[in-house]
């Protein structure tokens, strides 16, 4: 039995996906993906599976464990982990090209992070300045 483990990161969320032969079950933190709320996060997670097609989707079981970040960061981290797992599972370069053509961040990841707050007025944000008055 073949088992593949992959990871995906987005902002501060980290997802670990385990893919194995199965019947098309997808679980996020132990719950079926159908129960993931809000709906936009669920569709984000399912994007790579829809692009891969029913044939691949119904031949594997995917378990994803996600921690850190907010709900959308977690959904995008899970999406990256699932896409990488499917590419590694199939070994198909056409699938990899399809993912990259659809959305490059599905495989590559997004390096943007939040900017750290700077001293003085740091509660307002990293670049906030005191308003200057000339009169």
From Swiss-Prot:
Residues 108-118 have a biased composition (Basic and acidic residues). It comes from the Archaea. Residues 108-135 are annotated as: Disordered. GO terms for cellular component: cytosolic small ribosomal subunit. Pfam families: Ribosomal_S9 (PF00380). Residues 119-135 have a biased composition (Basic residues). Gene3D superfamilies: 3.30.230.10. This is Small ribosomal subunit protein uS9. It comes from Pyrococcus abyssi (strain GE5 / Orsay). The gene is rps9.
